[in-house]
Amino acid sequence: MKAYLATHFFDLFGFEGTAKIAERIREAFPQLELYVPQENKEINDKKNNDDIITDIAIYKADASELLSSQILIAYLDGVEIDAGVAGEIGMFVGSLETLKAIGMRHTPKIVIGLYTDMRQHGTGDNHMYKNLFVKGAINEWGCVVETVDEVIKLMDDFITNYPV
């Protein structure tokens, strides 16, 4: 079973937070092949390889891993959903919608959105908005949860019900 962790990781908190989420998932599922884009040095060692890391190289490396995964965990926090994360959600769900539209069966897959911001339950000025098209895509093929524990529970249920 393969999973893909889509997050923003270009600042200290994003990088360290992503590493902590990945660690929790790996502890819960040691047999799972978890791809975390920030760990792919071939496309992310910008200090030493910035001149050879291209947008196409990043796209090919990450898209290959994304499309071969059965589980997408998408981190949704931030003022906006990170553009890369939204693109990864779109590609993953789009591949499923295409197979569905042409009547082809596919390996079961799930999208789990992780949205931890406490303001999501606020009202008025205290409410945090997320794009409803993106949330709808997630909810059509999975759901949005608020904690890493809930992510792990959903992953456990999915892996139990759809072993590869």
Predicted regions and their residues:
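Conserved catalytic or regulatory cores that recognize and/or transform ribose-phosphate-containing ligands
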Residues: 1-164
